[in-house]
Swiss-Prot record:
GO terms for biological process: regulation of DNA-templated transcription. This is Myeloid leukemia factor 2. InterPro entries: Myeloid_leukemia_factor. It comes from Homo sapiens (Human). Residues 130-149, 165-186, 208-248 are annotated as: Disordered. It comes from the Eukaryota. The keyword Manganese does not apply. It is found in: Cytoplasm; Nucleus. Ubiquitously expressed.
Length: 248
């Protein structure tokens, strides 16, 4: 019933039987340079060092497979192959030293058994990178079942990193802050943060994200004023599309 996802033209009478044909066709042309340009040239010098052509697996026609849409030797398996090729090209462009990248992934789990409020788990991971081994990582977790809300932000320069993690439980009111250092001593944290800000200022004329520390006030504490701003801007940071941030 279903075929391998392969190059077909809209006038092909079997075209409508392949629900992913248009998507696969566009992806194949992008990866093989069929459009004659790259969406990443605007942030490079116009060259595409290290990019790879689409694999033969993407361009070859396949055979009829009744299990194709179940992800067995066709269908989604071919989509995974195309995505792997795209990720590989992204890695090669980043290694070229003249490219900024942004990636984001989100997982959401929803459960409603009918006896109480629905249970929702959401986890989002983001990464921004710039030449020179500069990266900013961000991970947020929300779990309605346990009441946990957690956010961690990491600043990386090659193999060194300073990671700040904050969590709170909106049911119990408990809050926790933790800082991790990779190939750094705690005494070097301030100098590392200054270096990270200097490096990122070359790519964006805007105050980079700063770690806001809780200031002790007796048994409790208060947080610094002002929302964080990311040094390496991603698509969701545009004025027309502001994502929700956890500002604790």
């Amino acid at each position: 019933m279903f075929r391998f996802m392969r190059d077909v033209e809209p006038e092909d009478p079997m075209f409508l039987m392949d629900p992913f044909a248009i998507h696969r066709q566009h992806m194949s042309r992008m990866l093989s340079g069929g459009f004659g340009y790259s969406p990443f040239l605007s942030i490079t010098d116009g060259n595409m060092p290290g990019t790879r052509p689409a694999s033969r697996r993407m361009q070859q026609a396949g055979a009829v497979s009744p299990f194709g849409m179940l992800g067995m030797s066709g269908g989604f398996m071919d989509m995974f192959g195309m995505m792997n090729d795209m990720i590989g090209n992204m890695e090669h462009m980043t290694a070229g030293g003249n490219c900024q990248t942004f990636s984001s992934s989100t997982v959401i789990s929803y459960s409603n058994t009918g006896d109480g409020a629905p249970k929702v788990y959401q986890e989002t991971s983001e990464m921004r990178s710039a030449p020179g081994g500069i990266r900013e990582t961000r991970r947020t977790v929300r779990d309605s079942d346990s009441g946990l809300e957690q956010m961690s932000i990491g600043h990386h320069i090659r193999d060194r990193a300073h990671i700040l993690q904050r969590s709170r439980n909106h049911r119990t009111g408990d809050q926790e802050e933790r800082q991790d250092y990779i190939n750094l001593d705690e005494s070097e944290a301030a100098a590392f943060d200054d270096e990270w800000r200097r490096e990122t200022s070359r790519f964006r004329q805007q105050r980079p994200l700063e770690f806001r520390r809780l200031e002790s006030s007796g048994a409790g504490g208060r947080r610094a004023e002002g929302p964080p701003r990311l040094a390496i801007q991603g698509p969701e940071d545009s004025p027309s599309r502001q994502s929700r941030r956890y500002d604790w």
